[in-house]
Amino acid sequence: IKEASGYPQQAAQITSCELPEDFVVLSGDDALTVPFIQNGAEGVISVVGNAYPRLFSHLTHLAMEGRINEADMIQTEMRAINTQLFQEGNPVGIKALLYLMRLIDSNSLRLPLVPASSELSERLDTTRKALDVYASHLFA
């Protein structure tokens, strides 16, 4: 189940119940991945992971290995991008970010959705550049 209530304790409540052996709880909130894993989630269905698969995978694996301080440091560095991605709704933010990263050819969306505002695109681009520097040092 994708748990995106915003309450990591919800994962603990679910996993404390008698569940089928193949039942898995996944975080559905990028910004709360670490606390969800601490509360029994076994992974994440991520938005930001589409733009930063290596960084977000590393964060997730650290949390799953119990290396919470290291995972929290990465989560903190990703706070701004996680916030910005949802300021104009999903998938507006991630589409704009992927376009800025030149990973997709267009940031157009189907109506009634519209592309990200120029203000959000500028903030995403600034944040992206800082996060790219952080990731390059982390994986150097």
Question: How would you name each of these model-derived features?
Answer:
Residues 31-140:
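Structured C-terminal cap/extension of enzyme domains
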Residues 1-37, 42:
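Ligand/cofactor pocket segment of small-molecule handling proteins
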